[in-house]
């Protein structure tokens, strides 16, 4: 039987939600992830240090006994985020980054940034204190085709931020295009990217051909196969600029299977197993550990995890749903098999 032992991985982008759902999301992600960058797009969002730290406490209260899982918190940037708030967040020791949501770009982004110039003072403070800048890289102009919004964001917005803040560490999150791969590859060492398992395993045909499959609908949206192949090549390249970020984003079954369904795919139930499938598909299992366990902490200037996990090449069937608070979530690969499992 094929087995792989790797340093315990981390998830550098996840949505844990809040309230009754928190118990279930934390249960799933803490099974073998050491740490996770927790997105702040709650209702209301974590726009200040106090809100982010009380959210940290709620997450920690749900970590199962015996797990060493540690949430890494993120500040939600708004037009009014002050340099003093950035310094206060950094001094907390638990908030490691601040997140740009262009207003209206994704779930619970209505409080986001309307004009980048509004956050330039905050970005200057982040550059000064060494706080990372996380970016949802899509424009929100309704005249821009949804499949082009990442590329246009990179061309019109991100390139300028990188030029204006050369010492700021920037993570372009959940990249979905060859354009993003090329930009990150060619940028300075201060620019990196996360890649999801579902963008490595699937493209827009899986979502749209032969019927609409709403559980593949996420933002940024799945792109064509050529972009999927570029993502696989980047993840398996050995480059230190790319690392694991699931963007696991649960929504209740009825919120996905609806006339106007929510954006987000749930992968926390089997994150590293799905990544193993993706890396195996391009004969690059030897590159999985760096992508999942080394590149993220190295970029964040945090220690790598000291312990290991073992993956076994053994098929198992994913349940049709998992509990999510007082409802259920349909996970990626629901009712189908996954080729790997954690021993």
Curated annotation (Swiss-Prot):
EC number(s) on file: 3.5.2.3
Residues recorded with modification N6-carboxylysine: 99
Keyword Nucleotide-binding: no
InterPro entries tied to this protein: Amidohydro-rel (IPR006680), DHOdimr (IPR004721), Dihydroorotase_CS (IPR002195), Metal_Hydrolase (IPR032466)
A GO CC annotation given for this chain: cytosol
Necessary cofactors: Zn(2+)
Catalysed reaction equations from the record: (S)-dihydroorotate + H2O = N-carbamoyl-L-aspartate + H(+)
GO molecular function, one term: zinc ion binding
EC category: hydrolase
Record keyword Hydrolase present: yes
Pathway: Pyrimidine metabolism; UMP biosynthesis via de novo pathway; (S)-dihydroorotate from bicarbonate: step 3/3
Keywords carried by this UniProt record: Hydrolase, Metal-binding, Pyrimidine biosynthesis, Zinc
Annotated binding of Zn(2+) 1, by residue: 13, 15, 99, 247
Entries under PROSITE patterns matching the protein: DIHYDROOROTASE_1 (PS00482), DIHYDROOROTASE_2 (PS00483)
Function in brief: Catalyzes the reversible cyclization of carbamoyl aspartate to dihydroorotate.
Quaternary structure, from the entry: Homodimer.
Family indicated by similarity: Belongs to the metallo-dependent hydrolases superfamily. DHOase family. Class II DHOase subfamily.
Protein name, entry field: Dihydroorotase
